[in-house]
Amino acid sequence: MFITGSHKGCPYNFQDVKKSNIVSIGLRAKTARAIAVVLGGTIEAPLVLAKLEIALADPKIPATAQPYHEVMDLSWEESQKAVRKSTAAIEAIARKALGRLIKKLQVDGMRVSGVGIVGAKDRDLARIGNYHIRAHAAEGVLFRRVLDLAADANGLKRRTFSDRELDQIAVNELGAKSGGVKRKLNDLGRTLPPPWRADEKQATTAAWLVLHGPRK
């Protein structure tokens, strides 16, 4: 069973998972949105149950889409203060959106074992001299961080991965068990409707790393 689509009030039609009710969620942070994958099955034979896009911005609050671009002309210290209101709004959006997904899964008899989050890692943004590049970098960190906070607020076990380090972590932890991480991801993609891009694969990999696994 799989579902594709956007996250609008969690309008999903999940079916019961027959073999196991344990699932994990993988999230790939993007600007103003996240690619989400719900993964079931086992470590050796994972199964994509759903893939969808979660909105992390409110069209009624334009600044939530690219908050640092809105204050790009300010110094780093001033921009940090200026984005507080929009950042708080984004945090609330992420918390509620993830909560709706978790609730839907639970209503359908599934137990969420944890969430894996992929995105830009923390860095010293103040050292970036170009304001436009800094705005993009800051938003990359922000939209990953709000997913971290959303997972914590919803009481989920969480692992967070740098997008640049995820592949090597997956090889180290899953390679021997999966018979080849890339091959398995490609095999999973053949059973699903498009899209099946790098973002969906990264979200799936993150979910795979927390499926039935201990907290890291």
Give the positions of each predicted feature.
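Short hydrophobic transmembrane-like helices used for membrane targeting/insertion
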Residues: 1-3, 17
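Phosphate- and other anionic-substrate recognition elements at nucleic-acid/protein interfaces
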Residues: 16-216
